[in-house]
């Protein structure tokens, strides 16, 4: 393995290894996995130019900082179903989760460590993201959080079941698979991109108009000054 930025050196030798945040799908005759792509900034991924923080974070045990992520979403198979498993922070990215469905996922799963939020609104808001992902992609979702809330969502984003925060529990639910790919899954956050483009055009137009008006006013002021003389 090459000594690239995410690689970690093994002992004092010339061997290197990667660390991943991964989802496993274990069946009776198969083991599949995917590695988290959307790494959490500062905790799982830091810019290469800030590489000096890598050693600090590893020493202090505060952050990983050098995880290796997959380049794109990967769908896993279980029986007749294709599974899209979003890992923690990835569930906040609608377009990314939609890419699972565009690749054939008929069910979505979210696995997350929400313990570091503590008893704050953070874990509640993270739970709500799964509702949006269900609606955007018309997929049922099973969500598993180590400290809660875990739950099941139907294709309309309705909560079918949910656990309480920080209480041990086990829940079971039948979910309906869907193979139809929504417009959102195909095209992503097109509305936000259009909004950015329109905002950029309006901003440039406003700047250009302001400069033209400034030039006109300056010429008018000079003309008035000359007439007075």
Identify the residue ranges that each predicted region occupies.
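Soluble catalytic domains of enzymes that build or remodel membrane lipids, polysaccharides, and related
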Residues: 1-191
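Selective detector of the "anchor" transmembrane alpha-helix that sits immediately C-terminal
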Residues: 186-213
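Short leucine-rich amphipathic alpha-helices used at interfaces
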Residues: 163, 169, 212-213, 219-220
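Cytoplasmic C-terminal tails of single-pass
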Residues: 217-229
